[in-house]
């Protein structure tokens, strides 16, 4: 792997089934003109893209290959300037760029940019477009100065019609030595969830919520169709100043729903006695024809809360993505982190926003969790079949040799 001033790669140890599901991890190093490392990154990455073909939109998932290299366009920044960058190239004209910035106490990946070459017919067969397309997004990757950003859990960065998933990541910029710091700043996904002291009569966790079919209609017909079970996971401070985490199922039998529609915005609103408002806001990106959940708003009455209620809002999500006209489906439980104190747990999701034909769902786009759950048994089955074949061949060869040893006299 080439890098300014040189770069190194660590030996790779691939496990049989892990190698079948996820790509290999690699160490990427950027050095300054004196040969001193200023950026080090060690992670594996998966890219999930949607591109247009003559027969319609097509999803493509691929890994960052072991042969990926650090580009000479990577930079440590000029003198003590805060901006520096790691540019990774792979395949036929694909690049992943991490742009860093810092202040006196912390540094972060301010921007992640992915440029992919639609002329690469091996990666994007039957693409109706050619040339390089570039997407970018801010990230939550940040750490204290002189500490390594560490995240064993998956970290997803959504960029228009591309989702980049990093795994087992160790990243450090503005290095004080040529190695990762032993001190780490862990990502929020790796931190233990808040726990509460044992209570005399703890509230049991609720069972999976009931699945219900919701719909929202406007002047042009149905704009949102959803079948799902919803569960609220909230962390709050009680009147006794103890912090607790509780889960609440949304009971369809005690909930009313409504919403509104526009050309590029569809909102589902749920109300009940304690659930003053749960709003899910879906948007359509007209340039990419991608539909996704962008906003979640919660207003919940909690009698034992110190504030008497709980509120949370996030209007910058990019979840539950699908192509306009298609439906999104996920049988696996999904935990959507809305804020640090609120997660929306979703069960057996099947939904479609925009271009809904009456009360029927369009062509299905499966979620990544469902696709991964199918890959593992296929990989295990293939390995077992290969093992059985080897044993059978060994048996037949041994039997043939034993017969050859008994010749008629």
Swiss-Prot record:
Parts of the chain on the Cytoplasmic side: 399-409
Note the Gene3D superfamilies from the entry: 2.40.160.110
Q: Which InterPro entries match?
A: Lamp2-like_luminal, Lamp2-like_TM, LAMP_CS, Lysosome-assoc_membr_glycop
Q: Which domain of life is it from?
A: Eukaryota
The cysteines covalently paired via disulfide bonds are 38-76, 151-187, 223-261, 330-367
According to the UniProt record, where is the region First lumenal domain? Answer: 26-187
Q: Where is this region: Hinge?
A: 188-219
Q: What's a GO biological-process term for it?
A: protein stabilization
The record lists glycosylation at 34, 59, 72, 80, 103, 117, 126, 146, 161, 179, 215, 220, 241, 253, 260, 285, 299, 314
Q: Where is this region: Disordered?
A: 180-207
Which terms in the Gene Ontology molecular function aspect does this entry carry? Answer: ion channel inhibitor activity
Record carries keyword Transmembrane helix? yes
- Lumenal compartment spans: 26-374
List all Pro residues biased stretches: 194-207
Provide the primary localization.
membrane
State whether it acts alone or in a complex, and with which partners, per the record. Answer: Interacts with ABCB9; this interaction strongly stabilizes ABCB9 and protects ABCB9 against lysosomal degradation. Interacts with FURIN. Interacts with TMEM175; inhibiting the proton channel activity of TMEM175.
This one is known as Lysosome-associated membrane glycoprotein 1
Q: Which gene encodes it?
A: LAMP1
């Amino acid at each position: 792997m080439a890098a300014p001033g040189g770069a190194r790669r660590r030996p790779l140890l691939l496990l049989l089934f892990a190698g079948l599901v996820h790509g290999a991890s690699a160490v990427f190093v950027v050095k300054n003109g004196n040969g001193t490392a200023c950026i080090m990154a060690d992670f594996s990455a998966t890219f999930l893209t949607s591109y247009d073909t003559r027969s319609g939109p097509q999803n493509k998932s691929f890994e960052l290959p072991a042969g990926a290299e650090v580009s000479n366009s990577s930079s440590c920044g000029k003198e003590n300037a805060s901006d520096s960058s790691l540019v990774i190239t792979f395949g036929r004209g694909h690049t992943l760029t991490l742009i860093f910035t810092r202040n006196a106490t912390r540094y972060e990946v301010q921007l992640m940019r992915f440029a992919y070459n639609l002329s690469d017919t091996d990666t994007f067969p039957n693409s109706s477009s050619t040339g390089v397309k570039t997407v970018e997004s801010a990230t939550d990757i940040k750490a204290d100065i002189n500490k390594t950003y560490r995240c064993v859990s998956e970290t997803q960065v959504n960029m228009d019609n591309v989702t980049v998933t990093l795994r087992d990541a160790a990243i450090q910029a503005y290095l004080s030595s040529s190695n990762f710091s032993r001190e780490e700043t862990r990502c929020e996904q790796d931190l233990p969830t808040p726990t509460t002291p044992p209570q005399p009569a703890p509230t049991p966790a609720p069972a999976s919520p009931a699945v219900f079919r919701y719909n929202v209609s406007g002047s042009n017909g149905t704009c949102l169709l959803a079948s799902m079970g919803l569960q609220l996971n909230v962390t709050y401070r009680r009147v006794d100043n103890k912090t607790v985490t509780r889960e609440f199922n949304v009971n369809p039998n005690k909930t009313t729903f409504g919403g509104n529609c526009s050309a590029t915005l569809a909102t589902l609103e749920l109300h009940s006695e304690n659930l003053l408002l749960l709003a899910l806001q879906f948007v359509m990106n007209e340039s990419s024809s991608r539909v996704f959940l962008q906003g979640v708003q919660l207003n919940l009455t909690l009698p034992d809360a110190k504030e008497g209620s709980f509120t949370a809002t996030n209007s910058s999500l990019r979840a539950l993505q699908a192509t306009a006209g298609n439906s999104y489906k996920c049988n696996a439980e999904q935990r959507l982190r809305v804020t640090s104190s609120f997660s929306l747990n979703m069960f057996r999701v099947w939904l479609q926003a925009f271009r809904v034909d009456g009360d029927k769902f369009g062509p299905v786009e499966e979620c990544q969790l469902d696709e991964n759950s199918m890959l593992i048994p296929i990989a295990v089955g293939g390995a077992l079949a290969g093992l059985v074949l080897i044993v059978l061949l060994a048996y037949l060869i041994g039997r043939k040799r034993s017969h050859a040893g008994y010749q008629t006299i």
